[in-house]
């Protein structure tokens, strides 16, 4: 087995709080067909994101990433913080 290092790339991301009035949401997450909410107004609110691999679920505190080719997907906070740093 070989080892690999992730290439340094710059992505856009934000931490999703699940708050209905979150002002940090970038315009790209609100493009029709990218994402939709379930259980709005409840503690169980989730953000469903249409990805190349199918619909993925983001929960409160997850990071939402837009990759280098415009793909959007959720990432758990521990993985995000171990993989990315501010630029």
Where are the model-predicted features located?
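N-terminal domain-onset segments
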Residues: 1-52
């Amino acid at each position: 087995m070989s080892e690999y290092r992730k290439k340094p790339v710059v992505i856009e991301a934000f931490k999703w709080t699940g708050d209905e009035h979150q002002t940090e949401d970038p315009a790209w997450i609100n493009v029709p067909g990218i994402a939709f909410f379930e259980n709005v107004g409840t503690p169980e609110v989730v953000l469903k994101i249409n990805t190349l691999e199918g619909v993925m679920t983001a929960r409160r505190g997850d990071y939402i990433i837009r990759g280098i080719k415009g793909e959007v997907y959720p990432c758990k906070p521990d993985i995000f913080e171990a993989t990315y740093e501010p630029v």
